[in-house]
Amino acid sequence: VATVDCSGYPKPACTMEYMPLCGSDNKTYGNKCNFCNAVVDSNGTLTLSHFGEC
């Protein structure tokens, strides 16, 4: 199972670095920062499906 350590999030701004992750909502997130901010917003219901685009 793929996991991402989201401790230290949310962050107020994310870089434009493109290292895509696919969330359990079947949405592609551009990088770990964008994904982890969304995880925090979802109150932990969003998880990582896999690395790379959905």
Curated annotation (Swiss-Prot):
Broad class of the protein's primary localization: secreted
Keyword Amino-acid biosynthesis attributed: no
One GO molecular-function entry: serine-type endopeptidase inhibitor activity
Domain of life: Eukaryota
CDD domains, A to Z: KAZAL_FS (cd00104)
CC annotations in GO: extracellular region
Claim: Heme is one of the keywords in the record: no
Localisation per UniProt entry: Secreted
Residue ranges occupied by any Kazal-like domain in the UniProt entry: 4-54
Residues bearing carbohydrate: 43
Residues carrying the site annotation Reactive bond 3: 16-17
Keywords: Disulfide bond, Glycoprotein, Protease inhibitor, Repeat, Secreted, Serine protease inhibitor
Disulfide bonds: 6-36, 14-33, 22-54
A Pfam family: Kazal_1
PANTHER family xref list: OVOMUCOID-LIKE-RELATED, SERINE PEPTIDASE INHIBITOR, KAZAL TYPE 2, TANDEM DUPLICATE 1-RELATED
Domain-level remarks: Avian ovomucoid consists of three homologous, tandem Kazal family inhibitory domains.
Protein name listed in UniProt: Ovomucoid
Organism of this sequence: Aix galericulata
Taxonomic lineage from the root: Eukaryota, Metazoa, Chordata, Craniata, Vertebrata
